[in-house]
Amino acid sequence: MRVKNKKLFRVLGVVLTILVVTSLLGVGLQSIEAAEKERPIVVGSKIDTEGALLGNMIVAFLKAKGFKVVDRVQTGTTKVVREALISGEIDIYPEYTGNGYFFFSGKTDASVWKDFEKGWKTIRDLDKEAHGLVWLRPAPANNTWAIAMRRDDAEKANIKTLEDLASYLKSGGYFKIAASEEFVSSEAALPAFESGYGFTLSNDQIVVLSAGNTALTEKAAAIRQDGVNAAMAYGTDGQLAALNLVVLEDTKHIQPVYAPAPVVRQEVLDRYPEIEPLLEDLFATLDLETLQTLNGKIAVDGEDPKKVAQEYLKSKGFLN
């Protein structure tokens, strides 16, 4: 009888141990899951004006929706911020679809990146497979290389597109552009425009500015520095309207489409799937004119990017 009791006690002891261990494991797993849910979302961005604007929008919007957020806005250059996302140092940042051509050099046809929808879907599929990154739907804007002219000169010569510019140049019209060395020499920039539209600028028609940013090239055109009446620009540059410059339409789609989109690590979306519709609704409101205006408040008027972002979110009903 004692032997049977001993066996019974042993069995009960084993069962009790299993129950205790299972219970502890359950509590442990719940704690891990809870901790995962409590992990903050780290938001980064590039260091430029638009990077600061979009990054601050994402930070403010997610905070307003109750997410814990770590602000790493203006993380660094494209290379720095992308590597931070891939390594998991940050969880979200806004990137441009056209950069997919360089991220996956040699793996796609260049023409893909000149189409808004195809470019987005291509980088979405490539980055998800290669790095577990998810490209949400981009904003309906294109921040690509562009040529801008003084509005008065463009209107006087009836120049609205790069095709118009080509005809104007062939007829001997006056034109002088301020640009960076990269814009002048990169096969993807001025040479691509020249080849695509059938014109060639002489050295006398180009002023290369060493600093190489659009803030300086656009200002040079605005004040006619050294006779300049045109400038290297980006499509969403904030000071274009303020400086009375107009972007000439790239009717042949020579340049890739650089549409800004939130890029999120897959594991973060798995934890917080509601982020996707929230950010896509926000970015759907950011068309070209809107981004130019908002960028202008920062670059021209000197307003704080956080303030500009929050005021815009309030105006659209995203913040109370």
Predicted segments with their positions:
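Short, polar/charged alpha-helical segment
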Residues: T49-K68, P191, S195-Y197
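Contiguous mixed-secondary-structure segments that line small-molecule binding/active-site clefts
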Residues: G98-P191, S195, F199, N203, ...
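Short, well-ordered beta-strand elements
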Residues: K37-E50, F67-Q74, G173-A179
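Conserved dinucleotide-binding and phosphotransfer motif residues
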Residues: K65, G88, R224
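Short helix-initiation/N-cap motifs at beta->coil->alpha
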Residues: T49, D71-E83, E181, D204-K219
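Short, low-complexity disordered leader/linker segments with a strong preference
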Residues: M1-P40, N320
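Acidic helix-start/capping segments at beta-turn-to-alpha-helix junctions
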Residues: R72-I90, T97-F102
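Short, Asp-centered acidic motifs that coordinate Mg2+ and/or phosphate
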Residues: D91-I92, V228-A230
